[in-house]
Amino acid sequence: MKIKSLIKFLLLILFFIFPYALHAKKIPNLIGTWEGENIKSSVKKGFVRSNNIVEITEQKSRVFRGFVIHKSGKEKFVGVIKSNNKDFFWADSSDDDGKVIGTILNKETIETCYLDSGRDAVAGCSILKKIK
């Protein structure tokens, strides 16, 4: 009789816990190389289109780091995924005060938008595909 009661109790617990486990959101893995076209408007350079390459090299839970590849070299950044597991932000290591606001569109696609205010204002966005 005790075994039947124990089984019923365990089934009852599973009945209440299992639905929560199904709906728990998994933190997306952003590690990899991302590439795509960047479109931007700049006070100094006007409207510009260019290729954008981002490599995310490390991730622990929702925080990550990596670099953007420019013509002049690599620029390091650090970032964080918001608790909704869809939106993220990063700050680069340059002396400007620009920031990136991003959205995870799916496992293979992210959108990043860069904003920098001031005398040399820049606003631009990229749709980046994971290439490796």
Residue ranges and their predicted role:
Residues 1-10:
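Bacterial N-terminal signal peptides that target proteins for export
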Residues 5, 24-26, 66:
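N-terminal Sec-dependent export signals
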Residues 10-18:
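Bacterial N-terminal signal peptides
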Residues 21-35, 58-59, 131-132:
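N-terminal helix-cap/turn-to-beta initiation motif at the start of protein domains
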Residues 28, 73-75, 120:
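Residue-level signal for glycine
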Residues 36-48, 53, 80-132:
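Beta-sheet ligand-binding and adhesion/scaffold domains
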Residues 45-82:
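N-terminal glycine/threonine-rich, aromatic-flanked beta-hairpin/loop signature
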